[in-house]
Design a protein with these regions (language model features):
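Extended hydrophobic
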Residues: 1-163
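Extended charged low-complexity segments that act as oligomerization/scaffolding linkers
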Residues: 6-7, 24-26, 30, 139, ...
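Alpha-helical repeat solenoid scaffolds
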Residues: 28, 79-83, 147, 240, ...
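Amphipathic alpha-helical scaffolding segments
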Residues: 46-52, 101-106, 150-151, 158-162, ...
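C-terminal leucine-rich, beta-strand-based interaction scaffolds used for sensing/assembly
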Residues: 94-241, 245-256, 268-273, 284-287
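Generic helix N-cap/helix-start motif at coil->alpha-helix transitions
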Residues: 96, 148, 168-178, 200-207, ...
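Long internal repeat-built scaffold domains in very large eukaryotic proteins
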Residues: 202-312, 376-505
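Extended amphipathic alpha-helical scaffold segments
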Residues: 304-364, 368-371
Length: 505
């Protein structure tokens, strides 16, 4: 992105959000073609949607062609030619000049050769010389240069037909349908499912809705926030599909209504971590889960997330924090490493992330977040401001009277103690607080209510009290079965040997 912006000499003028919206090479190229050698001022966020970029690009080359004195203001020969060629190429790989010429009307016929050369220079079409044999006259063949541009033009034609209440029965490529769904939501404020005169399968409709919501402008996406939340609540599988197709692609756009903030709001809605884990933390295809409502086929994959110094803490970093609840320790390790690396270079942003997530009702997440915070504090070049701000927060929220009850977690206290001690060691924090961060702590500890029936219970009575060595209870008994002779296998082997002997006779 930065290389393209520099090469085309574009001044974004603090419009950092543009980087997140231009998610494909084609969108970036169109943007650079339109705004090259200029300063981007106040820009509407829907102006960088791919369909708007194509529309603006085609309008701009029409103006260039018009300024050359090739057509009048009332004519749109470039656009007309592009739509015509796109329509003809739906059934063919390439076209001859004569085929295009025979489909034209005046005044395009008189300017066709010039128009085709012009749009080829702009990259919309591609030409090659073809010969049947070495003695025949070369013939020019035309094919499409930019596939997304072809999809856009066909979608534009389909949209006009839909608005005229024509029934769309022919089948088109996924790229055309994607462009159509995006044009519909941008210009008609409708999802593709709201049109009765186009027939699509439920699966295709869902895919197109996700594509449109992930790629439309922020203003329009905000209208569908409640709708997306409703889809997320439908099932764990639907939720994971929404995360993969909508939330992940939009989370690098600052304050996107369908991005990581929506995910955070949804996951915080679970009363207990175990309820949330079924939707978010467990892997797919669990054994004996065919009849379970949490059965999933879509794996939550955040391995491709790469954090940069431009990332806001409420964007992709927030997703990585939530992934710390995974039951896969390799996933947790990867997320901790990414957050640590990012936090070292963006300590103020990480401080905001840490304090924002400190009230999540998941001990595993809280422990991992503070382990990252401690790791950053131990860095050789850690900023004093980070140590001071985080130490202040820890003293007010972890080692306060309320905090000792809320964070009654030895792991969290260990990391927090280490952070404050590091601030004291660096001589940026008051040493007098040291007696408050070292046990014993004075507070009313929370005690789990005892089950009275369990006091009189015997072994194997249903309450399973720990009546002998804890290590053996937790470890040995649980693994004992792995070291027993496999009676079923041995029995199977004996029967097999008898069967083989019988048939040998």
């Amino acid at each position: 992105f930065d290389t393209y912006i520099d090469y085309y000499n574009i001044d974004l003028d603090r419009n950092i959000w543009i980087k997140g919206m231009l998610r494909t090479p084609m969108a970036l190229k169109l943007f650079c073609d339109i705004y090259k050698n200029s300063k981007v001022g106040s820009l509407s966020k829907n102006s960088v949607v791919i369909t708007k970029l194509f529309q603006k690009k085609i309008n701009s080359i029409e103006i260039v062609y018009r300024k050359a004195g090739k057509e009048t203001d009332s004519q749109g020969m470039v656009m007309t030619t592009l739509v015509m060629v796109a329509n003809m190429l739906t059934d063919k790989m390439e076209l001859s000049y004569d085929e295009i010429y025979s489909a034209c009307k005046e005044p395009i016929k008189s300017h066709l050769e010039d128009i085709l050369k012009f749009v080829e220079e702009e990259g919309f079409i591609y030409s090659r010389q073809s010969q049947k044999d070495v003695f025949s006259i070369p013939e020019t063949k035309y094919s499409w240069g930019m596939q997304p541009a072809f999809d856009y033009l066909m979608a534009r034609k389909l949209f006009d037909a839909i608005k005229e209440n024509k029934t769309i029965e022919a089948k088109y490529t996924n790229g055309i349908y994607q462009m159509l769904s995006l044009i519909a939501i941008e210009e008609d404020k409708k999802l593709i499912s709201e049109y009765s005169n186009i027939s699509l399968s439920d699966e295709t409709t869902f895919d197109l809705i996700c594509y449109a919501l992930a790629n439309t402008s922020v203003e329009i996406a905000s209208v569908y926030r409640d709708y997306v939340k409703e889809l997320m609540n439908y099932s764990s599988e639907e939720f994971r599909e929404i995360f993969d197709r909508i939330i992940m692609p939009t989370s690098n756009v600052p304050d996107h209504p369908l991005g990581s903030i929506l995910l955070d709001e949804f996951l915080r809605g679970f009363e207990k971590p175990a309820q949330r884990d079924i939707w978010w933390s467990i892997p797919t295809y669990l054994i004996d889960s065919n009849d379970s409502y949490w059965r999933c086929y879509t794996e939550i994959d955040t391995s491709n997330i790469k954090l940069s110094n431009d990332d806001n803490y409420l964007g992709l970093p927030l997703i990585l924090v939530w992934r710390l609840s995974s039951v896969d320790n390799d996933v947790r390790k990867e997320c901790r490493l990414k957050l640590t690396e990012w936090g070292i270079n963006n300590s103020e942003q990480f401080f905001n992330l840490c304090t924002y997530c400190a009230d999540i009702n998941d001990e595993q997440i809280i422990e991992d977040v503070f382990s990252v915070a401690y790791g950053i504090a131990l860095g050789q070049n850690v900023q004093d401001k980070y140590l001071i701000s985080l130490s202040d927060w820890i003293m007010d929220n972890v080692f306060s009277d309320e905090g000792l009850v809320r964070y009654e977690n030895v792991v969290v206290r260990y990391y927090c103690t280490g952070i404050v001690k590091m601030a004291i060691y660096k001589r940026v924090y008051d040493i007098d607080v040291e007696n408050k961060i070292i046990p014993p702590y004075t507070y009313q500890a929370s005690i789990m209510p005892a089950c009275e029936e369990a006091f009189d219970a015997g072994r194997m009575s249903g309450y399973d009290p720990i009546d002998y060595d804890l290590a053996r209870y937790v470890l040995c008994d649980q693994f004992d079965c792995f070291f027993r002779p496999d009676h079923k296998t041995n029995s199977y082997s004996e029967k097999t040997e008898k069967l083989i002997d019988e048939y040998r006779r």
